[in-house]
């Protein structure tokens, strides 16, 4: 239409004039024509196209729309970051159930690998500098780590959970009702999640700091699941295929985050995101608190990691009572038998995700007790779960731990630790719980076997009560335990009439054997990490069936079958036993004396107790025992220093070339014979002495004071003058 409107219009017109009559009677002039034709060319101005008018109107409307959006859609984007984050592995499933492998919040502070720990990432550092975030791109990549030809039986699910801060019953149907992707084993997949699925509550924006409002900060979460048992087709045991629990996929995400409202909070970049495999000494046990709330008691590496962020009440600046300020998210695999330990709340454990908050107090600090919540909102309001639970081990599989809040956001972390303060280490019973690599170890942190006698020594000032002293003659006393095959056996104690049950929990320490030279290796608190490690030869399981003690004495000991027991002996060769009573987590030292220790134990003088090998006799125990570290055992006696004097005197050395070796200095070796400066110094003083002696001789002295003779090959020739 625009082309047609711009055409030039040519208009042809013919003008006819009324002529005269064609009468022949009138002559016709040659100068006059009969008909006059004219052609007019009219060029019209091109009219505006209708489409151009529409385009102008659209541009005007878009400009007005942008102005309106600036008013209603929040702050502008101040920073944008695109990066790839490796979230971790998806492993195989050992049962025919739905197992959660990980739950990763889309908050950029929490978008970390499962093994990052407390290390800052580029994304978390950028996010800690702003107050608002939103996600404009999310591509999830699954890289296969196992082939589909050999690994069979399972399917992997990924889903995006909008209401991620609340736990709920989970099944395959609930996963498929959300935005999800289903991936068979061995397939490389890229899942492109639409950004509208991650819009925040404030015109698409979320808060960065979860401590402000966790429900408005954490955002959606990416869940990773494995459904049905994973088996290895190439392996079988007893006719059945072996479950495959190793890695199936590596999960990576390509993300683009937008940030706004600059406000740096350095400590947010180093919130904990860690994974803890099952290990000896690490436990997670369900229990009830004193008010009946459901809690979990943690020990081992996961408890130490949480206490680094939230220290115990023994520190000068630490919380001493109430509920902690840090929220923790735990995701793990929970079997159905364990889920039944919480009546009515089994779905919470089956879902494999819940929130924890530490409960402070003297008893809770010692045990590492954390309250369980079903959502972040319940944790924020301290809405506890009240039901009677069975005290049972929660899980024996990997536990993923994520720190959701950070109370002190403006304290920059130093050396990978957020909010670390100077701890009170002394007195030793009040020292912070520390990590020790093994039961007995050397300076390199290497394990030292406890098979031999005298590998470690117990020293303590024990605590006693009125029931600690027991008087009755026992002729063949013994302590029963189960050996490696599970058979009940025992080790004998000395026959005696006085028996002592002393508590060494507070003051007991373990020394390494003298040849190690490590000194104190464990307190009774750190020993809890290893006291249930029955792979150590020194630690056995108590068995009352083969224990020969008075029944009243057994009742006072109050031991349960399976409690750890260690064979000990003092330096006099009197055998004893060290028990760890699991009912109240006390260390009990049990031994006999030949005389009454006294009503208040005023007559007892404590000795050191050393570990006694179960296969050693009393004489072998005493022969192996070493109580002094002899440092120069392999050193030879140093040779006496030879201080032979030189034949030349100090004065003569100024004039003669002494046969001296190279003398070692702190920077270099200097040769006296070849030193130019020393040669000049010697000649100067020689000339001075010659001049002084000559002046003295010429002053009238009858006898020469000094006779100078030449050295060298001509030394045997006498001087002609007798004087220089």
Swiss-Prot record:
Keywords: Capsid protein, Host-virus interaction, Inhibition of host complement factors by virus, T=1 icosahedral capsid protein, Viral immunoevasion, Virion. Residues 13-39 have a biased composition (Basic residues). Residues 1-39, 700-724 are annotated as: Disordered. Transmembrane segments: none annotated. It is found in: Virion. Its main location: virion. It comes from Turkey astrovirus 2. Specific enzymatic cleavages by the host yield mature proteins. Residues 423-629 are annotated as: P2 globular domain. One of its GO terms (biological process) is symbiont-mediated suppression of host complement activation. One of its GO terms (cellular component) is T=1 icosahedral viral capsid. Self-assembles to form an icosahedral T=3 immature capsid. Contains the P2 globular region. Residues 630-724 are annotated as: Acidic. It holds the Pfam family Astro_capsid_p2. Belongs to the astroviridae capsid polyprotein family. InterPro entries: Astro_capsid_N, Viral_coat, VP90_C. The keyword Ubl conjugation does not apply. This is Capsid polyprotein VP90.
